[in-house]
Amino acid sequence: NSANMSFALCPLLNAGAIAAISHVGSAEQKARYLPKMISGEWTGTMNLTESQAGSDLSAVRTRAVPDGDHYRIFGQKIFITWGEHNMTPNTIHLVLARTPDAPEGVKGISLFIVPKFLVNPDGSLGARNDVHAVSIEHKLGIHASPTCVMAFGDQDGAVGYRVGEENKGLAYMFIMMNEA
């Protein structure tokens, strides 16, 4: 028996994203994203690290600006495993970001769903969201895993949907980390 760690990271991260949305996502988020993530039609990613916020997530600068029933996400994340690929038609990014009045430190981080392609109410794919890979990281031993620098909001802001309560994003991200 053998395994390919580069490839295995994709379903492992997807399982973590499924767990986080299952535990703290709204009924609408669960209905919209989980069926295609569970079936493997879509994949999920974990977006924590920033150039100035590696192991110190209190320094996260990615912003989430309220805009009606969603948020506009602005920022850049690094070391995003399976951040950009063509293996599935959509990637559901789970992103840590700060809302305008968030307290400082890790107690001011919220979690957002930021899909690569927006998802219409009927489940079909809509427009490309304002999220893209800036570059591919070169990591020893897992060359088949597209680990990326991801940019959110270079144009009008990436559309994001808050998962769970505001300012509890780090606790929610640990659900994903423990599963993945």
Task: Go through each PLM region and give its residues.
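Glycine- and acidic
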Residues: 1-5, 14-19, 45-47, 74-79, ...
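Structured core elements
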Residues: 45-47, 61-65, 72-74, 79-81, ...
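A short core secondary-structure module
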Residues: 70, 74-128
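Short Gly/Pro-enriched turn/cap motifs at secondary-structure boundaries
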Residues: 52-55, 84-86, 101-103, 139-146
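Internal helix-loop-helix
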Residues: 1-31, 35, 39-40, 88-92, ...
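Short acidic, glycine/serine/threonine-rich loops at helix termini
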Residues: 19-25, 55-60, 83-92, 106-107, ...
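A glycine-rich, basic-preceded beta-loop-alpha segment at the flavin cofactor/substrate interface
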Residues: 79-81, 118-134, 139, 146-178
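Gly/Pro-rich turn-and-neighbor structural signature
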Residues: 21-66, 70-72, 78-79
